[in-house]
Amino acid sequence: MPFAIGQRWLSESENALGLGVITALDQRTVTIYFPAADETRIYAMAQAPLSRIVFSKGETLSHQAGWQGEILDVQNMNGLLFYLVKNPQDEDVIVQERDISPIISFSQAKDRLFSAQIDRSTHFALRYRTLCHQQAQFKSPLRGLRGTRASLIPHQLHIAAEVGNRVNPRVLLADEVGLGKTIEAGMILQNQLFAEKVQRVLIIVPETLQHQWLVEMLRRFNLHFALFDEERCNDFDLDAVNPFTTESLIICSLNWLETHPNRVELVLNAQFDCLIVDEAHHLVWSETSPSTAYLLVEQLARIIPSVLLLTATPEQLGQESHFARLRLLDPERFFDYQTFVKEQEHYQPVVNAVESLLANKALSAVEKNHISDLLLEQDVEPLFKAIASNNDEEQQRARQELIQALIDRHGTGRMLFRNTRQGVKGFPHRVYHQITLSEENDKIDWLIDFLKLHRNEKIFVICQTAATAIQLEQILREREAIRAAVFHEKMSIIERDRAAAYFADLENGAQVLLSSSIGSEGRNFQFAANLVLFDLPTNPDLLEQCIGRLDRIGQKRDVQVYVPCAKDSPQSRLARWYNEGLNAFEQTCPMGMALFSQFADELEKVRSNSTALSENEFSGLLKQTKTAREKLKIELEKGRDRLLELNSHGGEQAQALADQIADEDNSPELVNFALKLFDIIGVEQEDLGANSIVISPTGTMLVPDFPGLKEEGVTVTFDRELALAREEMEFLTWDHPMIRQGIDLVASGDIGKAAMALLVNKQLPAGTLLIELIYVVESQSPKGLQLNRFLPPTPIRLLLDNKGNNIGEQVAFETLHSKLKPLGKNITNQMVKMARSNIESLIMRGDQLVKSLAEPIIAEAKNQADQQLSAEINRLQALRAVNKNIRQSEIDILEQQRTQSLDELSKANWRLDCLRVIVTNKE
């Protein structure tokens, strides 16, 4: 059928888009706008998955103005359809097809049945189960949180859930090293992407961390980011195309943007929804002279709605630098540094009062006064009395209630999340081993002896350069046949994956992984507990990054750190400074870089020449460093904000969230569904044992391509712990693209839309006709409203007997399905032709019955949306009265969303999605 502008067409692959209208044509493509979803698609004419929508005389037509009428006649003029329709005022009016409502109900299932496109009964069962799972996953509070390839760490899940559910979140993630800020940012981002709150994301990082972020986003979150640099952008200059509009997920370096201001203009015009900046503490700011980098990020933060800044802890930053980060997030709230300082000073006594509450101490009169001043609108006297009572349960309840009220009013608690190792359980100890050698060249011999002595252990060795790692591998292989994997920045991501997998293999893998310091960025090896620093990192931050490859949450054993170096060499003195001055081998040292800068001149002498400082001078340096460290440590401890830590940690709620995901991990429901899905689609499965399988495409699949399935096959696991140890395996969860897109493949395609089966039942007359009808209630609305959380596509099952009675509640789906047998294709086609009249009558009966079942679902969705959105609006309005960090714009957006959501839910409709005709026989 020829295309014409103004014609109405339906997408066969994306039914939820509603009825589209052709807006543009050229020789090869057709452009269709879908008003209901506010989406545009461009299709190749030759293979467009589109169906022309033509209504017939006697059918009901829905006008975009909201009324319906019976079609009296249809005329075709130059490819466009004109309908003569009886409107509600009983007038005959002409309706052009462009005026038809974009929200359309259709029943392709019936068309497929009567055109002999009939599937097996097992395909129908897969479709129904898929629809049920789709509904459950849209409603799940775990959606967007459970699919990360990471251990279930409560504080990370709490931050991801808290921030991810917000509208346009703007927050500072300031956890201590090793607590997973990158994972938190990725989980927040994934949550927002799943909810379709954001679609275009820009991540700005230091140049050395670009690949780390690329790897983390891909391996942990299945997010495919593109790295942008000058070379990539140059490719688009001749075409006058803004390169930043060619990808939705982009990573680039801060230094590159600083040195190429013309690219910054392109970024500003690319309409990103979300900005993530790592190492944000390096953005230098003062009231009189902010740095170029700071001003650059400030420009972006002004126009990009969602902003996540990953930074050092506020104590490390200093108050002025901390204010500068907050100013990027909310310049209206944090407009003046001196005002901010006064607010912080005023708040410190409240923090002290919280320390008393947490320590179960009696509150002093001064502490009570400070709490009362902050909670003016709340009568706190009864809580004070309860705390002073002898009833332990009442005491604890009152203390928790006071703490929660103070958290809600925390000066920056809604914008700032900061966890410390002291506040988070699960860290092992670090044990330092100084290995003193006679000569520098003895290091290789020592390493060989060490590996032979620890043959049953996994050893992680970090060298300064890739060349050293490569040479060591050759020496170990040739001299002692020691199995070693190499890991460095010159390898591709796939090559690094293979090396990591070889090292992770407990049975036949490498004993040792030889890595350059840059090459290991973004990779963690908690299954190993022995670290050899073949070359010492050049500064404390790099040292912490190296140790942090093993010393992370999830490490089950104490981490052994070995540093081999020649006696009295520059390396040995640097090791002593790290150990005796900073204690950086056995503990994290937040003040390490500050002390490194303070003693930079002396350390330069140490590193360049072991005799540049006498032993007395060097001992003096160690004492000075230790004294300065202890002084800084006391200051940092004084500045700890326990209230902020409580808010960041999430407490019992965070643990409950982790437990919920763990329970789902252990449920067989996903495994059963996925294996059945692969089986019916025609994907080959090979069981490898140890909770993993290889899935491969075949030439007999029901679809030409299965999402995420490579030609050479993919190894997958449903086991979180195995996925953490074996990065080359895909970790399948309900959130994995392969499962989500597999569900979409079935739900939006034709698999199982019409089926027929035989029921052997001696108690029913032979030839008795039953029909199973699956309707779907849905709202065709803009993605940003996230109406799927209130009204996901919801299946309604009817099972009609030959008299039109719904017996679905009496006969469960799985019970019935287990008793059905397949019918041959020829018999199926003959039976459908013979019973067509009865089938059509039963479908019409189903259309009548479903209304009374669908309307309460829509009403409940509206009620739920109203209650949930109103509750959040009321909560934020109440908090805004006592906490300036609640943005009015956030409340305004929520109010608009509530109005629009209720309006769109009022337009929700239902459609017949699939059907199964069942014929009985005695045998």
From Swiss-Prot:
A motif (DEAH box) lies at residues 278-281. One of its GO terms (molecular function) is helicase activity. ATP binds at residues 175-182. GO terms for biological process: DNA repair; regulation of DNA-templated transcription. Its EC number is 3.6.4.-. Residues 443-597 form the Helicase C-terminal domain. CDD domains: DEXDc_RapA, SF2_C_SNF. SUPFAM superfamilies: P-loop containing nucleoside triphosphate hydrolases. It comes from the Bacteria. The keyword Nucleotide-binding applies. Keywords: Activator, ATP-binding, DNA-binding, Helicase, Hydrolase, Nucleotide-binding, Transcription, Transcription regulation. Residues 162-332 form the Helicase ATP-binding domain. Transcription regulator that activates transcription by stimulating RNA polymerase (RNAP) recycling in case of stress conditions such as supercoiled DNA or high salt concentrations. Probably acts by releasing the RNAP, when it is trapped or immobilized on tightly supercoiled DNA. Does not activate transcription on linear DNA. Probably not involved in DNA repair. Belongs to the SNF2/RAD54 helicase family. RapA subfamily. Interacts with the RNAP. Has a higher affinity for the core RNAP than for the holoenzyme. Its ATPase activity is stimulated by binding to RNAP. This is RNA polymerase-associated protein RapA. The gene is rapA.
